[in-house]
């Protein structure tokens, strides 16, 4: 006797998935001598009632297909549309700074793809391999007449090609550095990577983003306006001063003479200063108070009769100039085993025996007021937060909370609470140092030159801030593609910093930023039907942006442009 069936038709096939049992009707037929199985879904089988719950007709494949057909519409492809204003703005700016021209002279025909990728990266997507959507919704592809898809596969091939062309990259940098007649600012940072990139990325005990992944190092050179001119990639653990030696080699190769190199205070040491002046290069670095000679200079400043009021950028500073010498240390060596050098002041034994520098001690009343206000707010905030601590280890909690500021407090436990009091000399010590800074320079740098360089160094940090808005973690498998990716990102960063500089120079920082400029300009669209093309309406905001950035208001739709005036190329 056959088994009873659960339905009146064929015996269903039951399949368990998760906590549900699904029923199917399985049949077969012969086709070209082969057996073909056909499965039809019946519904969910309920073992308690021994019944099959009918399927939801609204969710079946046929229903979905019919619903999709009802929602479908024909895309009118004989009318072309796209965001135009942002593309137009960036093209006008890159022409003004000869970016496309330098790319064309360095890379030839592939330069158009490099510039297009950099502009697309800036407008739409922070990831190099995902710029295709930006090309589709903007006028960028039509603007330059780009045929390549620039999808992920194309970008992989492009970055590989660029990365292999280091000589072309160096030629491009040489053209960009031609404008650096007065100041070059240099700094380094680390970037995280999920791959070791053939040993380039390395684990560091400390990195700037506190990431538990391998890091590689990037050095960036900018001009006095904070616009990038050159980048270099290094292993993550490389000593920062080695990157400066590479920069000085580049300056020699590019024949940049009498240019002041500006570095962050992290580069300051007697040996580093000695290395730079031995290369016959001028430099400026902020001083660090932990050096004994600089503490002495700060102490001497208040009672000095050699202070003079100096004006820079419509601001008055009190300035004391002092000789600063270098002398080889008899008691220690540098980290690489070479000779170390100590700073000396006039009157010290052996002063200036191995080189002479300058130190400018500067005092700014406005900075003093700002720093005192910030200091008092910090003290008040920590005192308030200390009162809310309730822990088995209250002193440890407060120390972690206060960080370096713990040096201003006397701290002791009171049960689960913590008692904090200001140290007697804490306020006096901070007040005596507030508003003051020291600039260390080579012997032939004037105070006004050192201040110009000091301002420019701050703009280099802002350039890094722009770069960190992008994808900071890399998954690039090798350093060749990384080099190509960084080149495209460098184009994007150059345009960002140029726009930021123009906004700053127009005193419009409180009203505009780079993102606002691009997004506002992208409200200008382009439409083309057959041979007829036109722009959409242009707002007052867009006209203001064009005025601030020294760009003419667009009046026509442009297509198939070269990235520079090809007839003007040498």
Regions found by a protein language model. Give the residues of each.
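An anionic, glycine-rich sequence signature occurring as long contiguous blocks
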Residues: 214, 230-233, 280-453, 505, ...
């Amino acid at each position: 006797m056959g088994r009873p069936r659960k339905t009146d038709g064929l015996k269903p096939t039951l399949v368990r998935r998760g906590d549900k049992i699904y029923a199917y009707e399985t049949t077969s037929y012969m086709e070209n001598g082969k057996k073909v199985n056909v499965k039809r879904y019946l519904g969910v089988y309920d073992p308690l009632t021994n019944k099959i719950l009918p399927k939801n007709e609204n969710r079946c494949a046929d229903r979905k297909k019919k619903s999709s057909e009802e929602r479908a519409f024909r895309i009118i492809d004989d009318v072309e549309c796209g965001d135009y204003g942002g593309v137009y703005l960036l093209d006008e700016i890159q022409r003004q700074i000869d970016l496309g021209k330098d790319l064309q002279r360095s890379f030839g025909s592939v330069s158009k793809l490099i510039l297009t990728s950099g502009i697309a990266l800036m407008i739409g997507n922070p990831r190099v391999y995902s710029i295709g959507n930006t090309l589709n919704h903007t006028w960028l592809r039509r603007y330059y007449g780009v045929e390549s898809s620039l999808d992920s596969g194309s970008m992989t091939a492009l970055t590989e090609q660029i990365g292999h062309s280091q000589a072309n990259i160096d030629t491009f940098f040489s053209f960009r550095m031609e404008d650096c007649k007065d100041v070059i600012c240099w700094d380094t940072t680390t970037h995280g990577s999920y791959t070791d990139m053939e040993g380039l990325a390395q684990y560091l005990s400390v990195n700037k983003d506190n990431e538990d992944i391998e890091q590689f190092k990037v050095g960036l050179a900018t001009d006095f306006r904070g616009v990038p001119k050159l980048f270099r990639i290094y292993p993550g653990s490389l000593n920062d001063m080695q990157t400066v030696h590479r920069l000085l080699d580049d300056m020699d190769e590019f024949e940049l003479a009498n240019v002041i190199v500006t570095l962050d205070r992290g580069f300051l040491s007697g040996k580093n200063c000695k290395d730079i002046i031995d290369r016959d290069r001028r430099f400026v670095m902020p001083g660090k108070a932990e050096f004994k000679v600089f503490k002495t200079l700060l102490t001497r400043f208040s009672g000095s009769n050699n202070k003079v009021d100096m004006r820079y950028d419509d601001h008055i500073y009190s300035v004391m100039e002092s000789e600063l010498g270098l002398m080889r240390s008899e008691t220690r060596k540098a980290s690489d085993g070479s000779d170390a050098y100590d700073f000396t002041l006039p009157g010290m034994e052996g002063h200036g025996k191995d080189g002479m520098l300058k130190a400018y001690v500067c005092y700014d009343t406005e900075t003093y007021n700002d720093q005192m206000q910030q200091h008092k707010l910090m003290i008040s905030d920590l005192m308030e937060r200390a009162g809310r601590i309730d822990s088995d280890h209250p002193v440890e909690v407060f120390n972690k909370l206060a960080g370096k500021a713990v040096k201003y407090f006397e701290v002791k436990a009171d049960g689960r609470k913590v008692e904090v009091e200001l140290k007697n000399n804490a306020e006096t010590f901070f007040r005596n140092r507030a508003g003051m800074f020291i600039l260390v320079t080579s012997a032939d740098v004037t105070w006004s030159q050192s201040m110009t360089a000091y301002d420019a160094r701050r703009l280099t940090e802002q350039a890094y801030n722009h770069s960190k808005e992008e994808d900071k973690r890399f998954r690039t498998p090798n350093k060749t593609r990384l080099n190509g990716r960084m080149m495209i990102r460098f184009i994007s960063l150059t345009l960002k910093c140029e726009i930021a500089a123009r906004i700053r120079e127009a005193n419009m920082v409180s009203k505009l930023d780079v993102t606002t400029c691009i997004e506002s300009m992208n409200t200008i669209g382009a439409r083309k039907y057959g041979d007829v093309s036109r722009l959409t309406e242009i707002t007052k905001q867009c006209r203001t942006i064009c005025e601030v950035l020294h760009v003419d208001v667009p009046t026509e739709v442009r297509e198939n442009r070269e990235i520079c005036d090809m007839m003007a190329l040498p």
